[in-house]
């Protein structure tokens, strides 16, 4: 994308932050690859919204899936999102994303510092290395934004948002692992019943020394 060299993509869970970044990127590259982690456990509303926005915005949508279907995984290991959510995320999110990122040099995200204590030191541009040794730039344009700024952008630009937000969820992932936050000051505390704050897709890479501004 403009000012950066290499092949770029964006990971998108169709939450509002991702839609803001995608809205901005489409003004530069309307065909930027949009990587969606299709875990098989998303809300029905998420799938419907994804399909609607993919058609309306003519997205270059790439669905990343685990090697096993939900039925195959549950037959082999039981319902991991209840017994071992970290392993479930590893199989259905981390491993597919690790494969999906290999062709790219630049990875755009909708991460923000105020989303969770685990993200408080997030920089807008970071150098990351995949487990395979592939290096890439991880770019989080909204790192210094807050929730109000995100929603103001959504409203100001008339962007349709995922209807699940209207049920009171400030952070939305797989349906079995999404609930109302236990800590009102930490929107991600409603994920995985408060057992953890990250699924692993933003922690499986090795972060090198950043080169860019805060």
Describe the function of each predicted region.
Residues 1-214:
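Nucleotide-activated chemistry modules centered on ATP-dependent adenylation/adenylyltransferase
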């Amino acid at each position: 994308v403009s000012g950066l060299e290499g092949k770029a993509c964006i990971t998108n869970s169709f939450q509002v932050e991702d839609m803001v970044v995608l809205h901005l990127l489409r003004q530069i590259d309307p065909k930027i690859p949009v990587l969606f982690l299709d875990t098989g456990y998303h809300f029905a509303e998420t799938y419907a919204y994804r399909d609607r926005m993919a058609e309306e915005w003519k997205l270059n949508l790439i669905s990343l899936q685990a090697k096993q279907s939900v039925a195959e995984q549950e037959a082999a290991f039981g319902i991991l999102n209840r017994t071992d959510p970290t392993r479930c995320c590893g199989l259905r999110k981390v491993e597919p994303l690790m494969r999906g990122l290999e062709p790219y040099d630049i990875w755009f995200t909708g991460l923000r510092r105020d989303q969770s204590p685990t993200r408080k030191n997030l920089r807008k541009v970071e150098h990351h290395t995949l487990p395979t040794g592939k290096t890439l730039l991880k770019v989080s344009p909204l790192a210094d934004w807050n929730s109000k700024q995100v929603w103001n952008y959504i409203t100001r630009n008339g962007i349709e948002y995922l209807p699940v937000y209207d049920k009171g969820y400030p952070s939305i992932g797989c349906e079995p692992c999404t609930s109302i936050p236990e800590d009102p000051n930490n929107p991600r505390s409603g994920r995985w019943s408060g057992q953890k704050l990250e699924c692993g897709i933003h922690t499986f890479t090795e972060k090198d020394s950043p080169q860019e501004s805060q």
